[in-house]
Amino acid sequence: MPHIDVTQQSFEADVIRQSYEHPVIVDFWAPWCGPCRTLGPVLEALADEAKGEWILAKVNTEEAQQLATDFQIQGIPNVKAFVNGKVVDEFAGALPRPMIEDWLKKVVPSSTDKAIVAARGHLRDGAFDAARPVLEEAHVEDPSRIDVRIYLAEIAVHDGKLDDARAILDKIP
């Protein structure tokens, strides 16, 4: 399912509570709005491609006028990103797909970002063996991330493999 239709009654459960598990992208729209009919399918396609990394929630402002008022919707389409129960970013208008993709990168953590958070937790707990495979996978996914290389070098130093640490750090541009 590429999106969920949200009502005034379901907003708390479908958006606010869900946003503690995954980012929720809320599309405020109306059936009569031409730009909304252009933007909607783009957001739905991106949500489908995201495979659960974030949730697309659609609010018909004609049916949920109080939500539109509560969130100060001045014009539609209006898209807001909710994380941990709060709006973290938004845009208005029917942006082209590449601009929406760039916007999503700002508000939805990548799998590499999530891996780094998990690895930092392992490192903080002294669980270097648990952090290593997480960081190695993150490095394969995004070899340009310098922070991943630094953490891998830290693990090598911890393991007494100074030459390995130096080799990892030497590859940083």
What are these language model-derived features?
Residues 1-51, 65-66, 72, 76-78, ...:
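Proteins that catalyze or organize thiol-disulfide redox chemistry
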Residues 61-62:
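Conserved SAM/SAH-binding loop
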